[in-house]
Amino acid sequence: MRMPTGSELWPIAIFTIIFLLLVDLMHRRQRWTSRYPPGPVPWPVLGNLLQIDFQNMPAGFQKLRCRFGDLFSLQLAFESVVVLNGLPALREALVKYSEDTADRPPLHFNDQSGFGPRSQGVVLARYGPAWRQQRRFSVSTFRHFGLGKKSLEQWVTEEARCLCAAFADHSGFPFSPNTLLDKAVCNVIASLLFACRFEYNDPRFIRLLDLLKDTLEEESGFLPMLLNVFPMLLHIPGLLGKVFSGKKAFVAMLDELLTEHKVTWDPAQPPRDLTDAFLAEVEKAKGNPESSFNDENLRVVVADLFMAGMVTTSTTLTWALLFMILRPDVQCRVQQEIDEVIGQVRRPEMADQARMPFTNAVIHEVQRFADILPLGVPHKTSRDIEVQGFLIPKGTTLIINLSSVLKDETVWEKPLRFHPEHFLDAQGNFVKHEAFMPFSAGRRACLGEPLARMELFLFFTCLLQRFSFSVPAGQPRPSNYGVFGALTTPRPYQLCASPR
C-alpha cells in the first residue's frame, strides 16, 4: 500500500484541526448563555489549561473569584468546569442539590490500574448503585469493627503509645515528626484492613508509605490534568509506566498484601477485618455480573482507604505539632487542660473530649487554618441545576473551593491567623461553625470523618500529655505557610520533644 506523501498529508492535517475547532466551538456554544457563570476567555482546544497556576491553585482561584465572583467557569480542553466559592454557593450545590452534584468526573488514567465500571472504589466512584453499595458496606464494616465503639478506640490508643515511645527514642534531640506520624496513622488503617500493625522499622512498611506518597504526587499537578482531558495521550507507548511508576508499584504491593491475606482467610470464621468482610461479599456475589464486590474492586477500595485515611490525618497532625512549637502559649493551655481533666497517668479517652473545650477548639482550628485539601474532590452534575442564580448544565465538573469558606473573612474573626478562639464562645465553651467543612458536605462528604476525629483527638492529646514541643536551639523559626500539592503540607521542619 502506497504511503501518502507530505503534500497529501497537509489537507488531512488542516481538515483535522478545523474539525477539532468546530467541535470545540459547538461544545462551548451550548454553555454560552447569560445565566452561565462568567470566566476567563479560553484558548481554542486547550481552553484555560495554560492560564491555571498549578503550583498554587487556591491563590489563582482567589484572583479569579475577585474578578468574576463566587461562581466562575473554566474550560479544560473539552471539559467544562465551574468553581464554587463561599459558604452560600457550596451549601446550595452540595446540600440542596446533594443528589444532583454527587457524581464524580472520570479520571481516565485510573483505567490503567484496575479502575473500571465494576471496580471504582469509593472515593472516586461514579454516583450510582455501585457507589451506594460500597459506601454502605464501608460504613457498616467500620461500625462493626469498632468505629464509635471501645475496640477501635483501644487500637488508636495503643498505637498512640507506640508513637510516644518512638518520639521518646529521640531523647529530646531535633527530628522531623512527619514520618512517625505517617506510620502511626497508617497502622490504624492497617488494623481495619488487615487486622495487624507494622513495626515502624519494617522495610516493607517503609516502602508502602513511600509508594503511597509517590502515588499522590504523581496524580497531582499539570501533567495528570493534561492526560485526563486528552485521554488519547494515554496510548503513547511507555508513557503511563513512566508517569505513574509509583502508582504501579503501589498497586502491585497492595496485590501482594491481599494475596497473603486471602491465604489466611477462613470463610467459616467471623471476619477479622474489612478485607475478610469484603471477601465474604465477593463469595455471595458470584454469578452476579452487576455486583461491585469483586477482586479488582477490593484492591481499589483498599487503596482508597489507605490514601484517604492515612495522608490526610497524618498531615493534619504534622500541622498541629508545628502550631504547638510556634505558639507555646497555646501548647501550655492545652497541657493545662489535659492535666486537669486526664492527669499525667491515665491515657486519654474519647469520653474526655466533651470536657476539654480548648483542646477541641485547637484541633478544629488546626484543620481550618491548615486547610490541607483546599479544593476538595471534584464533583459532577447529573442534571441541570441553578446555584446563586447561575445555570450549571448537566455534565459540568464542579471544583469545590473549601479554602474560600475556611478562610472567609466575613465568617472568621482572624481568617489568616491561627486563632483557636474561633471555636470558643465568651464563656470558653466549644462552638462549631457552619463554615467549618474540611470534610466537605452533602452526599459525598468524607466517610472517614468519625475515624479521623478520633485519631486527631487521641494522638494529639497523648503526645501533649507526654511531651513539651519546642523549636530546636539554633534553628530558625519554621514557617506556617504551606506547600500546595496533592495536599497542602507544612514546609519541612524539626522539633524537640522533651518529656514532661
From Swiss-Prot:
One Pfam family in the UniProt entry: p450
Tissue/organ expression: Brain.
Signal peptide per UniProt: none
Sites where the protein binds heme: C446
Required cofactor(s): heme
Enzyme class: oxidoreductase
GO molecular function terms attached to this record: anandamide 11,12 epoxidase activity; anandamide 14,15 epoxidase activity; anandamide 8,9 epoxidase activity; arachidonate monooxygenase activity; heme binding; iron ion binding; monooxygenase activity; oxidoreductase activity
Subcellular location: Endoplasmic reticulum membrane; Microsome membrane
One GO-annotated biological process of the protein: alkaloid catabolic process
Catalysed reaction, written as an equation: an organic molecule + reduced [NADPH--hemoprotein reductase] + O2 = an alcohol + oxidized [NADPH--hemoprotein reductase] + H2O + H(+)
Membrane topology: Peripheral membrane protein
Record's GO cellular component terms: cytoplasm; endoplasmic reticulum membrane; intracellular membrane-bounded organelle; mitochondrion
PANTHER family per record: CYTOCHROME P450 2D6-RELATED (PTHR24300:SF1), CYTOCHROME P450 508A4-RELATED (PTHR24300)
Family: Belongs to the cytochrome P450 family.
Listed name of the protein: Cytochrome P450 2D4
Species of origin: Rattus norvegicus
Lineage of the organism: Eukaryota, Metazoa, Chordata, Craniata, Vertebrata
